[in-house]
C-alpha cells in the first residue's frame, strides 16, 4: 500500500464515523478501523468481535478533531505533574460526553453516562479542594517537590482526615466498590462504558505523588503501595452496595463542607505562622490565645453536634 492511499484512507476514517453493524433489533455495533485492510488485519477480518456501545477511547477510535493529551513540563524540560493535573483530569467529564457522539447512537447509554458523570462531579470538587490543602501546606506546585518535602514527616499524619477523604473520594470517582453504581447498571444500559479511559492513567500517579513520602528505601516503594491495595480490596470485601442518593449526599453534604473547612483552617494557620515568625516576641502570647480559642471552638462544636444528634428527630 502506497503512502498517498494510506493517508487518504486514514483521512476518510477520521472524518466520518465507522459503519454500523446491526447485531440484533436492539443492539448496534461498529466496525473497527482498518478492518477491511489486508495490510493491517490480514484477510479482511475484524480486529475484535466485542460489542461496542459507540466509538470511544476504550474502543481505540479517536473522534475527529480530538486534541492530543500532553503532560505539562517544568522549567528544566522534564515532564512532571503540577496543579494542572486537576485541569487535565477534569476534561474527561465534558469532553467525554461531548466528544463521543453518544446521543446519535444510544440514548440509554447517554443517560447512564450522565449519571456516572453526576456521581463523579462532587467527589472531584472535593479532591480539588484537598489538593489545594496539600499545596498550601507544602508550598511548591511540582509533584516531585511535593514528594521531597515529605522527607521529615509524612503529610498523612497531621492531615489524616484529609487523607481519609482523599482515599474515599478516589474510590467513588474510579467506581470502585462500594461505589460501583455505574457498573451495577451494566446489564440494563451499560452507561459506564460511555466513559472513561483516563481514570486508571491519571488517578494512580496523582494519588501516589500527593501522599507517598519522599524518604528513600524499600518502605516508600512497595509497602505503601501494598497497603493502599489492601485497603481497596478490604473496602470491596467489607462494604455493601449503597444507594445513589446516599452517595450524592455524602459527596455534597459531607465531603465538600469538610474540605472547604480544611482549606480555611490550613490557610488561617499558615497566615498565623507567618505572622508569628515576623514577630518572635509575641509567640507565647499568641500561642496561649490561639489554644484558648481553639478549645472554646472545639468544645462548642462537639456540644452542638451531640445536641443535634440527640434532638434531630425534633428538627426533622
From Swiss-Prot:
Pfam families documented for this protein: NADHdh
Chain ranges passing through the membrane: 120-140, 153-173, 256-276, 288-308
Primary location group: mitochondrion
Compartment(s) where it occurs, according to its Swiss-Prot or TrEMBL record: Mitochondrion inner membrane
Broad enzyme group: translocase
This protein's record includes keyword Secreted: no
Catalyzed reactions per annotation: a ubiquinone + NADH + 5 H(+)(in) = a ubiquinol + NAD(+) + 4 H(+)(out)
One Gene Ontology cellular component: mitochondrial inner membrane
InterPro entries: NADH_UbQ_OxRdtase_su1/FPO, NADH_UbQ_OxRdtase_su1_CS
Superkingdom field: Eukaryota
Record-level GO BP terms: aerobic respiration
Family per similarity comment: Belongs to the complex I subunit 1 family.
Role of this protein: Core subunit of the mitochondrial membrane respiratory chain NADH dehydrogenase (Complex I) that is believed to belong to the minimal assembly required for catalysis. Complex I functions in the transfer of electrons from NADH to the respiratory chain. The immediate electron acceptor for the enzyme is believed to be ubiquinone.
Listed name of the protein: NADH-ubiquinone oxidoreductase chain 1
Organism: Citrullus lanatus
Name of the gene this protein is made from: ND1
